[in-house]
């Protein structure tokens, strides 16, 4: 089965049409932060990540007035994850109060079910496109110039709410 349906088991996220991520700001003045220094021995890690993200269509070049810094975070397997510090942008973002389901909400609904499934959404945030008017505020500083996200990045204050809403739409009627 895995071989027959290989195309659905991929490391490359595909975009959903269920929703887009919109960023609503409390001010018009763009957020501009200074770049954080990247240690020389990690520049190749960042460069490869940028190449991969450009090739997958996750990011694109930007000429926006916004600029957030990159942070390389060491993972438990000693590799690095490239993250964007959206802290200043998050401060001026209108909060989305989308309710998150808790285990106490979910487990009673599972009682008495005949079949159970799990989902592992490959890079799930990257499956959600950014609304066109919100792309510029995701811009971040690289040695190659500014880049911005075409899809929803991690680290934005309302990303979890948008993702939760998308999963809810995806699973509607499956109970």
Language-model regions, residue ranges each:
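Retroelement reverse transcriptase polymerase core
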Residues: 1-175
